[in-house]
Amino acid sequence: MSWQEKINAALDARRAADALRRRYPVAQGAGRWLVADDRQYLNFSSNDYLGLSHHPQIIRAWQQGAEQFGIGSGGSGHVSGYSVVHQALEEELAEWLGYSRALLFISGFAANQAVIAAMMAKEDRIAADRLSHASLLEAASLSPSQLRRFAHNDVTHLARLLASPCPGQQMVVTEGVFSMDGDSAPLAEIQQVTQQHNGWLMVDDAHGTGVIGEQGRGSCWLQKVKPELLVVTFGKGFGVSGAAVLCSSTVADYLLQFARHLIYSTSMPPAQAQALRASLAVIRSDEGDARREKLAALITRFRAGVQDLPFTLADSCSAIQPLIVGDNSRALQLAEKLRQQGCWVTAIRPPTVPAGTARLRLTLTAAHEMQDIDRLLEVLHGNG
């Protein structure tokens, strides 16, 4: 089989399963409205959970940062790309979340890959929730360590895996809020069983940070858990992009020596770090509390309105509200019907989610209004 035949066969298989991914160019993709092809849609696909991507204070901070520092960092943080603004952001994140240190990364995917690649050796074991994000499972699969997956949020299964002999160290990996189902991990129980077996816990809280808990401190703070490694990302609740790893001082020093994604990547622009500082200030403020309260009210309204639809509603109290349809083609058809009626919704299909669980992944944000939720419910009931 030639290269072209191999590529064609893979694409043909995706088409046959109604699983071929495609991108839609949009004029505006975050916030309350999505604009595409000169048409405005209510946007129920964005991860901009607090509606901060268009916040004037954060926009001004980025603009001022660009004027002061330029539009690029100029290099890796190990060479010339680590600015006083990066340092200030790391210190503010560490203080906010109760850690000694924070290290910035260009994306959550890079952060997860870097940590697992740097920490895990051949004699070690990773125990990962089977529904963990692709960045975690891919990194674990590519690492030299043994990978064992435990049933979703099943602490008993996790305990059995950790109890089996392991010559090295054990790392338990999970998410705070799961990206495709919107449900939360039982972090306190997971941490307890992890500690019983002398393991470390790594939590990716991409979808919880900024959005839940006191001052938006996220899933771990809410559940009174402090994992050895906490990954937070800035493309969701913060409304920007990038990520950080929270850890002890010695682990931070270790990652600065051995995390290749950090060492060999150009740092995020200082202007971006300046915008993230402004976003963090909003998240921690009374305005942040008000946005979280508004989002919670929207979620309550939505869940009350979809109970009688002929779909499976995931057990989620988060901004991620999936309606599980099952069939790929049915999910695509529903998403298209909703778009035709002014609601931009994305169909998520295997392999992103397990086979037979194609869904409409609906996301609500503090930028929405109650009438937006009512319109979404009206359209869903008309096509249910």
From Swiss-Prot:
Substrate binds at R21, H133, T352. Gene3D superfamilies: Aspartate Aminotransferase, domain 1, Type I PLP-dependent aspartate aminotransferase-like (Major domain). It comes from the Bacteria. Keywords: Biotin biosynthesis, Pyridoxal phosphate, Transferase. One of its GO terms (biological process) is biotin biosynthetic process. Pathway: Cofactor biosynthesis; biotin biosynthesis. GO terms for molecular function: 8-amino-7-oxononanoate synthase activity; protein homodimerization activity; pyridoxal phosphate binding. Its EC number is 2.3.1.47. Pyridoxal 5'-phosphate binds at G108, F109, S179, H207, T233. Competitively inhibited by D-alanine, 8-amino-7-hydroxy-8-phosphonononanoic acid and 2-amino-3-hydroxy-2-methylnonadioic acid. The modification N6-(pyridoxal phosphate)lysine is found at K236. Belongs to the class-II pyridoxal-phosphate-dependent aminotransferase family. BioF subfamily. Catalyzes the decarboxylative condensation of pimeloyl-[acyl-carrier protein] and L-alanine to produce 8-amino-7-oxononanoate (AON), [acyl-carrier protein], and carbon dioxide. Can also use pimeloyl-CoA instead of pimeloyl-ACP as substrate, but it is believed that pimeloyl-ACP rather than pimeloyl-CoA is the physiological substrate of BioF. This is 8-amino-7-oxononanoate synthase.
